[in-house]
Amino acid sequence: MKSILTFILATFLLFPLQAQEKVYTVDNLPKVHLQNKMQYVCNPAGILSQAACDSIDSMLYALEQQTGIETVVAVVPSIGEEDCFDFCHQLLNKWGVGKKGKNNGLVILLVTDQRCIQFYTGYGLEGVLPDAICKSCLLYTSDAADE
């Protein structure tokens, strides 16, 4: 799980950013997983390349098949003045990420104008993926990008 999160974060840092400046809200951000059960990355502004999205989608599909953990990634240029943590929490609830009754969803949010990467786990994942591990993944990836 940690290696998958590290790969996703590294992808965010290594692929060129091609953002259009649009402010996204929880209401206007498309939930791509509803349209295609094998698509986990919401990248409406095209910030990540299609190859990066395909790679992340493939990894997250395998993760869900092996563990039942549903993970979605949202990559947007801006959420306005909204707080990343609150936005991520709202996405988890609005999109219904995770299995009902298990609350085992994970939302990973990248907001380029705020230089923010945020994890939000459902209650059912807090034992498997506590905040300390999420923070460790962020720090590890940030350190690798600085080198």
Where are these regions (language model features)?
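Folded, non-transmembrane soluble domains that reside on the lumenal/extracytoplasmic side of membranes
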Residues: Q20-S142
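Bacterial Sec-dependent N-terminal signal peptides
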Residues: M1-Y24
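A short, hydrophobic C-terminal helix/tail in secreted or cell-surface proteins
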Residues: D143-E147
